[in-house]
Amino acid sequence: MITAIIFGLLSAVLWGTSDFLSRETSKSIGHYLTTGYVQFIGFIVPISIALFYHEQIPTFDLPLLLLNCLLGIFLFFSFIFLYRGLTEGAMSIVAPVTSGSAPAFAVILFVIILGQTLTKIEAYAIAGVIIGVTLSGVRFAQLKKDILRTGFPRSNAANKKASQAEMEHEDHEKTRRIVKGLDLSLLCSASTAVVYLGLGILIPRLGWLFPAIILKGAGALVAFAFLLLARKKFKIPDTRTFLLLFLMGVLDVGGLLVFNYGISIAGNLLPLVVTFSGLSGLVILICAYLVYHERLERIQAVGIFLVITAAAILLYFQ
């Protein structure tokens, strides 16, 4: 059990750090290109590992190969939904909902489809971690701003009343951001849960390395094909942005490889690996606190305490 938790936590640290760095690259080259570059770099790294260590290619039958490629498509969409949600929706809604619901969806799929079983203690502790992760991302002060914020400019609001049409438009924009943020975060979580489920099927049959190669390769192909078909502007990043992208790609695929290896040795503890990998949202919160000096709200401290308590319960009753 300790091993499953450790690998889940390691993947959370790597994924959370990579996602935290995406703010700057997304501003520089956009979310779509950031996704494409991160997936491509994530494809190169495991291939290099396989060549360096002379890893033997496992036997792929057609259904497993198609499943692996399909997961790459879901991986691409999970990134796009997340980045669009953070940009076009309310961040104070997208971040906690995504961090909390993705592991929840995945655990449900593991139990229903893969037949994974949980003891009552494990089920309660996993629920505690998921709730804690969700609470740790909630910032009521920012949430209030997001709900009250409107997308319609009111330049002369101090001198004259806004027309009824303007007020209706403002209400529509406010509602749109809240609903769109929630919709996209749930779509991201559902896509991520499907990827987790697919990896739970592939890794026991193909090992932990090669599914990551195909997953990232398919994700990169889909990303750049989308950019081409959608006629998005292709931009070569400057040196600083490229270095950030390279670091993000290495951290992201590092998290995937650690996650995959955790799955390969977890056995019936697969839900624990997935649940604790969901702490990537908490890692982003800690990075924001250290770099931007964002103070924790009381409810966030409660969420962190709940996560630590749930983890301690799991370790105590192992």
Language model features: what each stretch is:
Residues 1-13, 22-33, 37-73, 77-89, ...:
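Membrane-interface interhelical linkers
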Residues 13, 40-47, 123-133, 190, ...:
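Hydrophobic alpha-helical transmembrane segments of multipass integral membrane proteins
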Residues 16, 20, 47, 72-77, ...:
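Hydrophobic/small/kink-forming positions within alpha-helical transmembrane segments
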Residues 46-56, 106-118, 189-204, 251-268, ...:
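Hydrophobic alpha-helical transmembrane segments in multi-pass integral membrane proteins
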Residues 62, 98, 115-135, 139-150, ...:
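Loop-to-transmembrane alpha-helix entry segments
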Residues 70-75, 83-134, 210-218, 268-290:
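Specific alpha-helical transmembrane segments that line the substrate/conduction pathway
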Residues 188-233:
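Aromatic-anchored, glycine/proline-accented short structural segments
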Residues 254, 259-318:
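C-terminal appended segment following the main domain
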